[in-house]
A protein has these predicted regions:
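Bacterial N-terminal signal peptides that target proteins for export
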Residues: 1-11
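An acidic-aromatic pocket/loop used at catalytic or ligand-binding sites
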Residues: 5, 20-117
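Bacterial N-terminal signal peptides
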Residues: 10-19
């Protein structure tokens, strides 16, 4: 019995629908996956129109804490920040992410640290 025409196309469509919509629209910088809403404000610096906790939740799903270590780097009245380490960084790729909240400006930013070549 011959395969049904369009079978492969239908299988591909089903596979694409199984992928969450946000996974298709994520941004990549030096190999690091950032939230799709990230807006570039400088070299390797991005502003995200989400809360600090929402951005950390995004990174927990993309970069699990078991594999990507986190450490607090600031917790002051004006800034709260955490560093996410990439244990598999190669030259030219992301070495770490600094996620920080500027409390006075009520915004969350991401700084992508790139390993030197």
């Amino acid at each position: 019995m011959a395969p049904v025409p369009g079978y492969k196309a239908a299988a591909l469509a089903v596979a694409l629908l199984a992928v969450p919509g946000s996974a298709l629209a994520e941004k990549k910088v030096a190999g690091a996956i950032l939230p799709e809403e990230a807006e570039k404000i400088g070299e390797n610096r991005f502003r995200v129109p989400k809360t600090y906790d929402e951005v950390l939740k995004f990174f927990r799903t993309v970069y699990g804490p078991g594999r990507y270590a986190r450490r607090p780097i600031a917790d002051t009245p004006s800034v709260k920040a955490v560093h996410i380490d990439n244990p598999e960084a190669k030259p030219g790729q992301w070495d770490g992410l600094n996620v920080y909240e500027l409390k006075n400006e009520n915004e969350t930013r991401i700084f992508v640290l790139v390993k030197p070549k």
